[in-house]
Structures are given as C-alpha cells and as structure tokens.
Amino acid sequence: MGLCVFVVPERWAVPLSEPVAGIARGLEVLEIVRLDAPGRTAVARRLGPGRRFPPAAGAPHTLVVACDVPPVPGDGDAARRVARRIDAVAWHTTRRLWRDRPPVDDVVRYTVGPEAALDMLNVAGDAALRDRVLERVETLGDVCTIPFPVIRMLGADSPGFRARVALVDHPQYGRSVCKIFRPGAMEFYRRELSARTLLADQPLVPHLLDHGPNWLLTTEYTDDGAHRVRPLPGFGGIDQLRPWATRALAEFARTLHSRGLFMLDLSPQNLVSDPTAGLKVLDLEFVMPYTNFEVTPPPAQSAWTYRSLPAELAANIDLPRLALTRGVGNSVFHPAVAGLPIERLLGPARRGDGPRRVATQLGWYAALATGGRLHTALRRGR
C-alpha cells in the first residue's frame, strides 16, 4: 500500500544525498536507481506531458524507491494516512532542496498508489528491480511487525514517520506502549534507548519495561491535561503550560546538561500528565550528547536545550520542523508557551512572576487568535 517511486531530475540530483535524505526522513528507502539514457526517456514518457519537469529542472535522473511501513491489519484508515504521509515527505524534500537554491516548480515527481509505482519500476530498464523491491517490502513488513497483540495504534499522524506506536497487551506487563522503529531510523532508536537508560532515574522519563532489537516497551500513561492552560491558536497540539510544568521541564533540562546531554523537540505535544505518575516526556529521540559535535558543553545558562544549537552546527543534524523556537531551544521555553523569558525560568521564583506569566500568555493568545481571524478574513476576501 505504501510503495512509492520518487523521480529526481538532473538539477536536484547533485548531491543525490540531499533528496534521498529528505525522502528517508519519512519513508524507508528500498532502492536507488540511476537512469541510463533510454531509462530517462522511458520515465519521462511514463510521467506524461502534464507531469514532466520544467526545462530548468532537467530530465529524470534517478529513481528513489521508498515505502511506508505496512499498516496494521484491520486499519481501515490506513490508505488515507499513507497517501498523506507520502505527500508530506515530498513537500519536506522540496523544502529541504529549496534551502540552497532558488525554487523551480516541484523538485521531485512521485507515483500515487502501488500499481503506479510498479508500473514505473517496469520502465526503469532493470528486469530484476521489481522482484527485489517486492522482496524488500515483504521484509520491511516482517521487521516492523509489532511483537505483541495490538489493542490500538497511537500517534498515527505523527510528523516524525520514524516509528509506529501502539497500545499493546503484553503477556507479562499487560497494557503497555510499544514503539517500533523501521530499519532506516535505527539511529533514533539508539538515541531513545540510550536516553531512557541514562535518564531512568528522572521523574519525567517514562518507565522502560523492556526493549528488543528495534522496539521499546514502556508503561501506559493516561493524560488528564493538568499541565495545560489553553491551546495556542494556529499551532495544532501546542498548549500554553502551567508554571509548575514549565519549572519541572527547566529542571529536567538542567539535569540533561549536567550529564553532558541536550534535547531538541521538547514540545507540549510530547507531554502527558498522568494522575498518578505525574508529568512525562514521551519522545526522547532527540536527546544527544554534546560530544557528538566534539564541543565542550556551554555554561548551564546557555545549554542548547534552552538556547538551541549554534547556527554553524545546526546543518549537521536533520532537525525536525519545530514551531515557536525562535530565540529558544525548545517550544516549551518560548514565552508564548511558558509565559516567562528563559532567564526568569532558570532563576528562583520571584514576586510578580505569576501576573507577568498570565499577562504574557494572554497577550500571545490574543495576538495569535486575532492574526488567525485576520488571515481567514483576508483569504475569504480574495
């Protein structure tokens, strides 16, 4: 169901690692096929007049064959989600390539539906290609099969595309959460396993029950929303936070720094408040040591979790698209979310913090709500 062939034109094929990395962020790359002259002609013909590349982009150069992780049996909404995921991957790849060059139409073309993907493979000039790809699709399904009975899928629309998450019925632990990573995302699996092990003593880190070669099993937590004040208009899933939650996150970041670690993608979207276990940070894929960048950790007040990576280093990591991170390392520390500047969060609570926090959060809420209504009105007036 999730098989797709991306066609990369000459303009965007050097370096080829860039479009491949964009596609691999959300889909499993199965095969990369550099086209010979007859293959380029055949692929251009298969694309058809309405989907050929503009002259500035050049002729088809390379096929990148990719696949989404096969859906869980009985998932009636899988086809819609897979199509939306492939569209999102294509848009992410386009934006990635536009960073360094002027935009020229869409930078890739891609097939829609498995039949179209197989048709494209048939014209690539490699008689064994189709069989190799189908074998790898089957292997991908086997590797990414959740190893315990699934109660229901969780986080199906996550923009990360690196793992599947399910509520499962474990034979020993009962209801628990299994997160299984696809083969192309093993770096993220290793990061998360390392973080859950190194930070197991931290109250905000979910309890790791067990793990396998590419999966993690954690305690199931419910969410009563106690850490939330209100959702921010225009930022789906990002809520303003209560002061106790923000202080707990600032302390968590301080602990990370003391252990030579920093974290990106610390967002309100990744938080739950369990009535018994308290506040938890669900996603730890972007916990990393400073030594990865061969740098001496900065002073605690300048920790990257608070302040973000230096610009000269940010290009060395495929960062998630993070909202509300201008001037801060993570959105939980943005004034629109926390209500206080990071300097105030890192110091002891002071008189006047409460009214200032409330006023700042309300100000941001009103500004974003007004801006959203204005944007809608302007669109309707066109």
Residue ranges: model-predicted function:
Residues 1-151, 158:
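Non-catalytic terminal and connector segments of soluble metabolic enzymes
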Residues 155, 161-193:
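ATP-binding glycine-rich loop module of kinase domains
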Residues 179-212, 240, 244:
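A conserved alpha-helical element in kinase catalytic cores
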Residues 204-246:
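Conserved structural core of kinase catalytic domains
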Residues 252-256:
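Conserved hydrophobic alpha-helix
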Residues 257-268, 273:
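Catalytic-loop of the protein kinase fold
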Residues 274-378:
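C-lobe/activation-segment region of protein kinase-like
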